């Protein structure tokens, strides 16, 4: 069957409304609230999260507000629980409307593989991460995904839209490895073309590659 890379155990969506500083400027309260809503739906605590895929646009205003919201939620978590923070935008830039979906894919692959990929181009930690007791680690090389004893690996994914819409997902690794081995030896490969000659050519290419 199809492989399951992660399951969604909780989510939260809201809008900053009058709390935001401007149309394109987010709100600390709105972002922290949406993360807490997702944790509550998943019936877990901040200590259960091993990795957060941040919205992380790389802007001074946006990143500072997001880090304040994350510190607000995770700052009281146990200091002996390792928790990592990253953003796919450091690798690919801002993917516009696909940014949130790309973050889900990254977090799902990290859960499935048990490895958190590095966040690129981070050389100096920002002030918001080094004040007091930081709840996050920004890794510059691949690291093992933290696995709490007797619990599945879990990740949070944030995506914030222009106009103040905030979304946060809680993902966790699927039970039983996310799938099962198939015993099928034959598979149907659909092939189509605009005419028979091109269909025969395409079929021959498939036979060459799969043979």
Annotate each PLM feature:
Residues 1-193, 197-203, 208:
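Condensing-enzyme catalytic core of the thiolase-fold
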């Amino acid at each position: 069957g199809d492989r399951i890379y992660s399951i969604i155990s909780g989510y939260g969506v809201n809008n900053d409304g009058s709390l935001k500083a401007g149309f394109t400027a987010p709100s600390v309260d709105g972002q922290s609230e949406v993360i807490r809503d997702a944790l509550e739906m998943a019936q877990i605590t901040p200590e259960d999260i091993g990795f957060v895929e941040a919205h992380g646009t790389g802007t001074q205003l946006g990143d500072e507000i997001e880090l304040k919201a994350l510190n607000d939620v995770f700052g009281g978590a146990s200091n002996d629980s390792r928790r990592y923070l990253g953003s796919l935008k450091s690798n690919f830039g801002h993917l516009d409307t696909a940014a949130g979906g790309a973050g889900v894919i990254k977090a799902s692959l990290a859960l499935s593989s048990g490895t958190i990929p590095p966040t690129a181009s981070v050389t100096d930690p920002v002030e918001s991460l080094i004040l007091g007791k930081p709840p996050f680690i920004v890794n510059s090389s691949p690291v093992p995904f933290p696995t709490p004893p007797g619990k599945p690996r879990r990740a949070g994914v944030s995506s914030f839209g222009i106009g103040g819409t905030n979304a946060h997902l809680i993902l966790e690794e699927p039970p039983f490895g996310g799938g099962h081995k198939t015993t099928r030896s034959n598979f149907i490969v659909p092939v189509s073309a605009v005419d028979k000659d091109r269909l025969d050519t395409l079929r021959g290419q498939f036979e060459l590659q799969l043979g």
